[in-house]
Structure formats: structure tokens, C-alpha cells
């Protein structure tokens, strides 16, 4: 089943946790869920150049705490913090509550699955050969500390008449091992020939012991230390 399941969903409460962390009763759940979707959509559209990997939303009491994981945090913050203040005010209006923003820098975007997938999609839109884009991404990931990476592209690759799927893998990607720290993401490239789908799996080592917050903790430690997270 490891081959067919979403690697993140399979590892929830083992070494991963949810990106939306709050509890709601009754009809409030649907309202807050729709609000989360709108918040993420607005942030990704507003700071499209910031290379955002994920947005974590927490709602303790009447507060909304939003953590944005980005490779280029300066794009979000802006000159003297002007842009981040505008963003905070807009999100506060959307949520009708006080908003606290936390920007987390991703020091190694080459081993972040979401940024790798989006980078390949951007290259395909610019008509870069799909094999070159995939192999370049794999080489960069392995060079910067990934223990394994798998990339799958599907669609009218290279403008072919018949759609097909091609995949490349380097190193180990143990999908059945639940303690494996596997980052997974999908992206779409809107090319002149149609949509090309990209899936990326990045294996970053094993996390021993039960720790649902391990993934976020390792990313925070990498930000403060500036070195590769310990396995």
C-alpha cells in the first residue's frame, strides 16, 4: 500500500502532523476549513515569488497563528517589514481575529519536495526539456543531503501526441517504512500542449521514535543552526 498511499497522510501522527491545527464543533468546522483554504490561496497568490513550501495555521482561543515556510522570506517581509504588515492586516480582516505571522526560512529548497516540484513545473513552462529538468533537480537534491529522490512526470511530454508517464529515481525512497522522513508534493505545469503533472518524493533519513512534530521541529532547527537537520 505504500506505493499507492499519500506518504504524508500515511505518516500523520507518526512523524508528521497536520498543516491546520485547531478544533471546532458543529457548523464552525466548515467555516474554519473554508477560511483556511482562502488564507492559503491568498498567501500563495500574493507572495508567488517567495517560493512558499507550506502554510501552517493554528487557532488557539481567539488568535490565528500562521507560519509561512518560504525559501525567500524577504519577498514576504518587504522593505522595513511593510509588506508583511499589509499581509497581516488583510488576513486579520479575512479571519475577523488577531493574526500573528511567523516566517520560517527554508535554507535548503533543493530538498524540499514542494519547491522541487514547482521548480520543475516552472522549467517545463519555459520549454526546458523535461528529462534535463528532472535530472538536474535530482542531482541538486542528492548533492545537498537527500538520501533518495523520486520524480514522476505525466502528460504530453515534449509535445508528444500521446500522453505518457516517465519517472526517475536516485538513492533510496522506502515508501513502506513508516519511520522514514519522506517529503512529498505535487505540482502542475500549464504548457502549450496541456497540463503536465509532477510528483516528487524526497527521502531525508529516518526519524526514530514517535514524534508527530518531528518534521516541523527539524525545519526550525535547520533555520536556527544553518546546518543539515540531524537524522
Swiss-Prot record:
Any Pfam family matching the protein: KH_2
Cellular component GO terms, alphabetical: cytosolic small ribosomal subunit
Domain KH type-2: 39-107
UniProt keywords, alphabetically: Ribonucleoprotein, Ribosomal protein, RNA-binding, rRNA-binding
Gene Ontology molecular functions: mRNA binding; rRNA binding; structural constituent of ribosome
SMART domains in the cross-refs: KH (SM00322)
SUPFAM superfamilies: Prokaryotic type KH domain (KH-domain type II), Ribosomal protein S3 C-terminal domain
Alphabetized PROSITE patterns for the sequence: KH_TYPE_2 (PS50823), RIBOSOMAL_S3 (PS00548)
CDD domains found in the cross-reference section: KH-II_30S_S3
GO BP: translation
Subunit structure: Part of the 30S ribosomal subunit. Forms a tight complex with proteins S10 and S14.
Job description of the protein: Binds the lower part of the 30S subunit head. Binds mRNA in the 70S ribosome, positioning it for translation.
Family the entry assigns: Belongs to the universal ribosomal protein uS3 family.
Protein name stated in the entry: Small ribosomal subunit protein uS3
Amino acid at each position: 500500500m505504500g506505493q499507492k498511499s499519500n506518504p504524508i497522510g500515511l505518516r500523520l501522527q507518526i512523524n508528521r502532523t497536520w498543516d491546520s491545527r485547531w478544533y471546532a464543533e458543529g457548523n464552525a468546522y466548515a467555516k474554519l476549513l473554508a477560511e483556511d483554504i482562502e488564507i492559503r490561496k491568498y498567501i500563495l497568490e500574493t507572495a508567488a515569488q517567495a517560493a512558499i513550501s507550506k502554510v501552517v495555521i493554528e487557532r488557539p482561543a481567539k488568535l490565528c497563528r500562521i507560519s509561512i515556510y518560504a525559501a525567500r522570506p524577504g519577498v514576504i517581509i518587504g522593505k522595513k517589514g511593510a509588506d508583511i504588515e499589509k499581509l497581516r492586516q488583510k488576513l486579520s480582516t479575512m479571519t475577523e481575529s488577531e493574526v500573528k505571522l511567523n516566517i520560517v526560512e527554508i535554507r535548503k529548497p533543493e530538498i524540499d519536495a514542494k519547491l522541487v516540484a514547482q521548480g520543475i513545473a516552472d522549467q517545463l513552462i519555459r520549454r526546458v526539456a523535461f528529462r534535463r529538468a528532472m535530472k538536474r533537480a535530482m542531482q541538486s537534491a542528492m548533492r545537498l543531503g537527500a538520501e533518495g529522490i523520486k520524480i514522476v512526470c505525466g502528460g504530453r511530454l515534449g509535445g508528444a501526441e500521446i500522453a505518457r508517464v516517465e519517472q526517475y529515481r536516485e538513492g533510496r525512497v522506502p515508501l513502506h517504512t513508516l519511520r522514514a522522513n519522506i517529503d512529498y508534493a505535487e505540482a502542475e505545469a500549464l504548457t502549450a500542449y496541456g497540463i503536465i503533472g509532477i510528483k516528487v518524493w524526497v527521502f531525508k533519513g529516518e526519524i526514530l521514535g514517535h514524534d508527530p512534530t518531528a518534521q516541523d521541529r527539524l525545519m526550525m532547527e535547520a533555520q536556527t543552526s544553518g546546518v543539515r537537520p540531524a537524522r
